[in-house]
């Protein structure tokens, strides 16, 4: 029997919507990353973009466990000598673009390379409950029901 390898033309992409309200960031991100790569499908092929299009709504209402809300620090570098900057998770979530917490968590769970950039384009994160993708008829994925640890108390 030959090994099956999925061709890009044979990929069936679905649209999935996830409500992130009250969900733990890391657990949500690992489920989203798996869906984006397509590892939940039996015909998964590592070098082909066979994952789904994922919409995450209410990204501003995600939760951190423990004291990470106050203590977790996100770093970025300006490119200049001594230009390392840091922001806390609390600062970002209460700021102008709270969806970046979820975007960064998912981004850092995906392998790097040309396929990474293509896969990341299938992720759409919105801070409110409104999204412009109703025409795609996304099906709802209830992450909270998958495991009781996915929801923060």
Curated annotation (Swiss-Prot):
- Write out the entry's keywords from A to Z: Ribonucleoprotein, Ribosomal protein
The reply on keyword Chloroplast is no
Which Gene Ontology CC terms are recorded? cytosolic large ribosomal subunit
**Single annotated GO MF:** structural constituent of ribosome
Q: Identify one Pfam family in the record.
A: Ribosomal_L13
Please give the biological process terms from Gene Ontology that the record holds: negative regulation of translation; translation
UniProt keyword Amino-acid biosynthesis, yes or no: no
Name the InterPro entries on file: Ribosomal_uL13, Ribosomal_uL13_bac-type, Ribosomal_uL13_sf
- SUPFAM superfamilies listed in its UniProt record: Ribosomal protein L13 (SSF52161)
Domain of life (superkingdom): Bacteria
| Protein purpose | This protein is one of the early assembly proteins of the 50S ribosomal subunit, although it is not seen to bind rRNA by itself. It is important during the early stages of 50S assembly.
**NCBIfam families annotated for this entry?**
rplM_bact (TIGR01066)
Complex and partners: Part of the 50S ribosomal subunit.
Instruction: List, alphabetically, the PANTHER family matched.
Output: LARGE RIBOSOMAL SUBUNIT PROTEIN UL13M, RIBOSOMAL PROTEIN L13
Q: Which family, according to UniProt?
A: Belongs to the universal ribosomal protein uL13 family.
The name this protein goes by in its record:
Large ribosomal subunit protein uL13
